[in-house]
Regions:
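Short, strongly patterned local motifs
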Residues: 1-43
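A short small-residue
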Residues: 44-55, 136, 263-269, 325
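Active-site substrate-recognition segment that forms the wall
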Residues: 70-71, 76-86, 173-175, 182, ...
Length: 392
């Protein structure tokens, strides 16, 4: 039985999901566990997951949610990947009093579920660990960390090829259909791949490969900027213990220092595709206000990519026909989430046992008012930005 993997729908490996304003060096970086969309955070607390999925399913999901960072760092170490990374913990900063109560509750929940070192932080502790005084408190999750995701994508590809997989670049999939007892995937180059089973993981770039799938998610842009490498004296004052961070805003901010001492900051931007550097101006203003010591640092890179958000802010699995498994909805957390989900899906495809999956397999369902998404999302983003603390 041939178990070879034939991934298609790739452009240059690891780069097709990000549009860089400045071409050149491979500088796409974000913090693992940091890019979380508006409204999603409360749905990831263990108590909320257990309430939504009682019994063994909920316990499985909580365990899965808590293991995603382990999946990433374990693979990096197992395959000796050349991936710049740190694992000193993730801090969620609270920008309001309500946010302080939220993160205190969240820290207590994860501590109750066995996360050693999960704890709430005072305002002064948060300021000392992040290098900014813009938060009233926070919580520390020691499981989190940061990686260079392009290096990670290439490391995964190399490990897969070493295990016998074939990877085809510059071969976007254009059609998917049944061909007797198997599936045929057509590509833009005219070539096709036949397979007994297909896993469809197009997420924020889902097109028309499967009916209704693109209408099951909304896909806002996540924008990021990176400074030129900071002087060591400045960099040492920002996230001095190597944490990565995001916050409790509806339009959250996430930030970290990379291995070259670049300060990287991300957040929401226009729903439309960017047209000029001014589309990143709000992030640059925020960066300067949060970290005055870095305010004069030139911005070296600006880029963005689409994230897929589901109705319930959880990843969705669909199996509309035998041999076709669909995974969609990373909510901006694809590095850890999809690393762990890939292993779970592989176990399911090999065993046929549904309890190998962290979430139940469901039918594809349309997102409400999907055709008007750009209108209402733009209005929601503007409202959130006005009420999120005024940093931008």
């Amino acid at each position: 039985h041939d178990q070879r993997l034939e991934p298609v729908d790739l452009q240059l490996l690891g780069t097709s999901a990000s549009k860089q304003q400045r071409p050149g060096r491979d500088q796409a970086a974000q913090a693992d566990r940091s890019d979380r969309p508006a409204g999603e955070q409360q749905h990831q607390d263990p108590d909320a997951l257990l309430a939504q999925f009682p019994g063994a399913q909920g316990e499985r999901l909580v365990q899965f949610a808590g293991s995603t960072a382990d999946s990433v760092f374990d693979l990096i170490n197992k395959h000796a990947m050349d991936v710049p990374h740190t694992r000193n913990g993730w801090i969620q900063g609270a920008h309001t009093a309500a946010g302080v109560a939220q993160v205190q509750h969240r820290a207590a929940q994860w501590a109750k579920h066995g996360v050693t070192g999960a704890r709430a932080l005072s305002g002064s502790e948060t300021a000392a660990l992040l290098g900014t005084d813009k938060y009233l408190g926070g919580w520390l999750d020691p499981r989190g960390g940061g990686i260079q995701p392009l290096s990670y994508a290439r490391g995964l590809a190399r490990a897969a090829m070493n295990a016998g997989a074939s990877i085809y670049g510059q071969s976007p999939a254009t059609a998917l259909h049944r061909d007797g007892s198997s599936w045929r995937v057509e590509t833009a180059q005219g070539a096709s791949v036949r397979a007994e089973r297909v896993v469809l993981c197009t997420n924020g770039y889902t097109g028309a490969l499967w009916p209704g799938l693109a209408r099951s998610v909304i896909t806002p842009n996540s924008f990021q900027v990176a400074t030129e490498p900071l002087p060591e004296a400045v960099a040492n004052t920002l996230l001095p213990q190597g944490h990565v961070s995001s916050d409790t805003r509806q339009l959250l901010l996430y930030f970290r220092l990379d291995h070259q001492r670049r300060l990287i900051m991300g957040g929401r931007g226009p729903f439309r595709e960017p047209s000029s550097p001014t589309d990143w101006a709000h992030l640059e203003r925020v960066l300067g206000r949060m970290f005055p010591a870095a305010a004069s640092a030139p911005i070296a890179y600006r880029w963005c990519g689409r994230v897929a958000i589901t109705r319930d802010f959880l990843p969705h699995l669909h199996e509309p026909q035998p041999g076709l498994l669909i995974n969609i909805g990373c909510m901006g957390r694809g590095i850890g989430l999809q690393t762990a989900m890939g292993r779970a899906m592989a176990n399911y495809l090999l065993s046929g046992k549904a309890d190998a999956l962290p979430v139940p397999v469901t039918a594809v369902a349309k997102f409400p008012l999907h055709r008007f998404r750009q209108i209402y999302l733009s209005a929601i983003i503007a409202w959130y930005r006005m009420n999120d603390g005024g940093l931008a």
